[in-house]
């Protein structure tokens, strides 16, 4: 099972309206993080090459904080397809799928939710949505280019958004990759002290 599938299974398990089991939630996230770190140092499956694996010393995270596990309002608003800018010349087709409106620690936030049109054709990812975001921790505690959240097409207007699952794009680990550039509209003016930090032992590209 790959990283995205693990992520989806945990998000689905900790559903919005079910009973919240904090210990199971904590254990599941810790297991996910261990699997992610193990995959990065396994040369047979790592996104890193051998030289980068030697340089890599670990994945760092903010402490788990349920204040960043929030209820948000999802507003579906499908836009026209467009070419998403990336860190290279590659420009994959995306479209805006909707908006998330929420509050964290008394501060209002809004993020655009995107759909990758190539992944939409894959039956395993036809419900996959993508949220690139930046916040006030970038270039200090987190990767300067922002972080990502994965999301599934919801069937309700009230949805669970958990920033403890925020993860780095591949470009945070290696400049060899092509990563979507976080749109300026998805820059949060407040810090999000949850999810992945800058990778340990790797230059912040």
Can you describe what each PLM-predicted range is?
Residues 1-23:
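Bacterial Sec-dependent N-terminal signal peptides
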Residues 23-26, 167-205:
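Extended, aromatic/histidine-rich regions of cofactor-dependent oxidoreductases associated
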Residues 71-73, 103-105, 112-114, 134, ...:
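A structural detector for beta-sheet-dominated domains
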Residues 78-144:
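Mid-length scaffold segments of soluble, non-membrane domains
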Residues 118-126, 151-159, 200:
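Short, surface-exposed linear segments at secondary-structure transitions and domain or protein termini
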């Amino acid at each position: 099972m790959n990283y995205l599938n693990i992520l989806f299974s945990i998000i689905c398990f900790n559903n919005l309206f079910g009973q919240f089991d904090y210990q199971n939630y904590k254990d599941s996230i810790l297991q996910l993080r261990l699997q992610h770190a193990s995959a990065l140092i396994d040369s047979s499956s790592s996104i890193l090459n051998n030289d980068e694996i030697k340089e890599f010393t670990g994945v760092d995270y903010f402490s788990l904080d349920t204040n960043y596990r929030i209820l948000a309002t999802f507003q579906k608003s499908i836009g026209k397809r467009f070419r998403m800018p990336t860190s290279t010349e590659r420009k994959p087709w995306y479209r805006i799928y909707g908006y998330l409106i929420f509050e964290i620690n008394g501060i209002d936030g809004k993020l655009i939710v995107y759909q990758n049109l190539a992944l939409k054709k894959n039956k395993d990812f036809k419900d996959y949505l993508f949220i690139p975001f930046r916040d006030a921790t970038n270039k200090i505690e987190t990767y300067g280019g922002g972080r990502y959240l994965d999301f599934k097409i919801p069937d309700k207007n009230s949805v669970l958004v958990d920033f403890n699952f925020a993860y780095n794009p591949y470009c945070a680990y290696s400049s060899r990759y092509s990563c979507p550039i976080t749109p300026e509209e998805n820059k949060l003016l407040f810090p999000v002290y949850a999810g992945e930090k800058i990778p340990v032992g790797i230059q912040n590209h």
